[in-house]
């Protein structure tokens, strides 16, 4: 998907040299072959262009870049791991890309305070590992955790599979360091859980997708590392039964239920067929599956999980289930889940939605959306899966078997209209955790409160009066 709108003025060689002097020749990328990985995302859906990619190694260098960009009115696109799914990290109009990947230092870990301060280019998986080294847990977990960065996670307010128990990225950030459009540095790297000294500026930048400033560091909340983690893969008949199992799990497990993923059979089938080394956890076929996990500081997690599954069997909710016998099997369950998005690619065109509805409405949403999409495009294959525990469903639709991918993807907005109408009628959101970017930018004013949009525009004008920070994204 190429975005044609407001092309940027080409950079002069003299201006490129001034930017290059800030980061050093080694970290200023201009050769087209070297720039290429920064201007396209892994699905090939968005393709941009940029004359220059800057890879600063410090907050001071980021500030110098922003000062020069403001002085010369040069647009910037902040980019972390380039794993975003809505085109927010792509330079669509020839902007300068500011890659944060070299901002990769862990500045401080304080297990007594349960905090970690790290730079925005730290890969999520590294942050998890560093927390584990001091017997702590950083619970944000995503399929892209091996390549996505903390800055990107915060800029999109990522959710992930642990949001049921620990919340989304916003709730894991205690403080931020942010470079503003004019190069000023906001130092709000507080480790405090209680701080009522004025406006909460931190939350302006979380979920703003780099349109208000560039996050360069964050103070993150850590949690005690669980002593026991137990995981089950469950086969059942319907999302309604999954909802009943969720209710049982929440009653029996209290706060130890950390993940509860709903998976359609077609999503599981795609992962098994197209993933590397992935096997179906259950021998029989089932219309729906649940991947659930309990984490506890005590040793009774397995007993609790088995009791939940036993109640599900007694009530006719659970048809079959397997509890992971070891870490390897647990990882295999999660690999199947994590590969679901990538496994849709070999099936042709895929129209993706990241929606949320009230938890109780999930079964009705899936049933109504499936019927509406198939009516619109006969043969289309809905592939719903996601976080039932918080109502966030990745409602993806694969093209009909044997269909033409380009023709199918050309109907993206038609499918959006059908799906979003149902979402909004049920009191939901068109973007649960992936952000707005350019993919949902044009729909945002239609679904967001008008006063909220006005306030967002006012904040953007105040913090970025020249509009140089990730232009054309979100608003």
Which residues does each PLM region occupy?
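Noncatalytic alpha-helical scaffold of FAD-dependent oxidoreductases
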Residues: 1-475
